[in-house]
Amino acid sequence: MVVYSIVYTKKAARDIQNLKAAKLDKKAKALIDLIRKKPYQTPPSYEKLLGDLQGAYSRRINIKHRLVYEVLEEEQTIKIISLWTHYEF
């Protein structure tokens, strides 16, 4: 089984502080642990994104916030794009 490396964009790294303040960091960490091992596993469901984020995926942290990530298969890496808000960049 492949375990993917995780990298964070600058925005995602800043989002971690917001998650901690909102007490959502444990839920986000559980999702990151899941996608590190199986990025396409359902449940929990994920959504393929379109437009500017085409090629990225989204999973719900809560009703307002999403984990947005890209799977870089060749590098065996998951790039975390955002952890806060609902696709507002």
Region spans (language model):
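A short, surface-exposed loop/turn module that caps and links secondary-structure elements
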Residues: 33-59
